[in-house]
Every structure is written in C-alpha cells, then in structure tokens.
C-alpha cells in the first residue's frame, strides 16, 4: 500500500505531509494429517486505521467537567500476527498465537492541566502491545437433545507506553463462553448462554469480573407457520464492565452502566402470500376435441 496525504491548515498556517509504502503479507501453511486431524501455521501483517470520531478535534462535552476530543494527527496501527492452529474432526479447534501491535490507538482520560476538576478523554497513539495467548473452541452433541459450543481464550499481554502519563503494565486476561441448545421435544427448544470475563487486563484497563447469563425458550407449531419465543438477557445484571487504570499517577475508575437486563417476547406468524398462488385454469367442455385439431 502506498499512501500520500497533504494537510493544509489555514488557521495555523501549517502544512503536514505524510506518506508511506507498506507491504501487508498473509502466508499460511496447512497440513492434513488424516481425515480427522489438521494443523496449520499462519502469519499476517495488517493495518488498522482510526475512524473519523477519533480524528475529529472538536470537543464533545458530556458535562461541564468532562469532554472528549479527537486527534487529527493520529497515525494508523500496524499489526503482526503469528498463529499455530490444530483442528480435530471439525469439532475441536485450538490456536496458539502471538500478536504485536505498534502504535495502538484509542481514547484515554487525562486531568485537564488548566483546571484539575475537568477530565479530558483524548485520542492518540499511546501503546505498543504484545500478546501471547491460546484460544479453544469445542462443539459437541449429546444424543438428540443437546448441542453445546464451548469457547475460551487466555492471553498474557504487555503494554509499553510511549507517553509519561501512562506506566507500562502487563498481566493476564481470559474469557469463557458456553452456548447450549436443549431440544426438549420436536417443537420446544431451550437456550442457555453463559459468558464470563475473568478479572485481568483488557486493552490496558484492569477489569473486574463480568458475568452474563441468558435464558430462552422457543416453540414452533406443527405446521411450522408460527414461532413463539421468550428470552431473558443478563439475568443477574452482572455484565456491566468495571475497570481502572492510572493516568499521571492518578487512578481512574470506571463503572459503566448499560441497561442490558431485559425480557423479550417474540411472535412470528407465517400467513403466506396470496399473490404467489397459482391461478386456476378453466377449460371448456370441448377442450379435448380442440386439442386434437
């Protein structure tokens, strides 16, 4: 990829030039051991660009003490990923991976130097990130009544800051999920979904435990023309993320509130389309005689 940009600011009377030539290869080798076992090695180089909101320099006030602003001088991030994967019988999959991200970008919170009461959420390229982890996925079926998908990820990450406002941190992070479908009868199906984010480091933040539990039940009539389902999401209201990090030596704590707990009832009725029905064909009493002519 070759990119050349030129930015002209009439207000500041400045010109900013930026150009680069980058190659982003993707290489993979797959070896079929037998019909049930497959192993593969992959490498990929990628680029990640900030969206417009992160580049927008204008301030967005959420209160008289807090505002957010983008950074038009942000650079893209470059990602290198190496992985070793193994798959068994299309039901068990595991991958060991190493990911290196240079100049990762995002928004971080600072105390306003002009007024210490104010908090500023400012975008920038703050960290170089190295992550070593393992991902596991297992699908199995128990008889005719249960289908289960189990996934898990464990990662050890290192965050190297390029600004004095943030210290270098490193640590573990892991998450697991369990997705179950229970076939109680030919027309009645139950659902159970569990997701747990174990306390650890995620995107530089030190997060507390977040647990999600969803339950559901679905009924389909004999002719499959009607489906009635009921679903309860975030049953215990424990999925809200809570995390913290240090900015300029001051601990920033965040307790996000998302109204994710709800009950959903759905009715789907298939009525049909009378316009797609074939029109009847009428024949006269002497149609057979006419066809002989």
Language-model features: where?
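Transmembrane beta-strands of outer-membrane beta-barrel pores
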Residues: 1-6, 43-49, 58-59, 90, ...
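Residues on the lipid-exposed face of transmembrane beta-strands in outer-membrane beta-barrel proteins
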Residues: 27-31, 82-88, 134-140, 154, ...
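Outer-membrane beta-barrel signature, preferentially recognizing the C-terminal barrel domain
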Residues: 47-102, 119-132, 141, 258-261
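Surface-exposed extracellular loop regions of Gram-negative outer-membrane beta-barrel proteins
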Residues: 1-13, 20-26, 145-156, 175-199
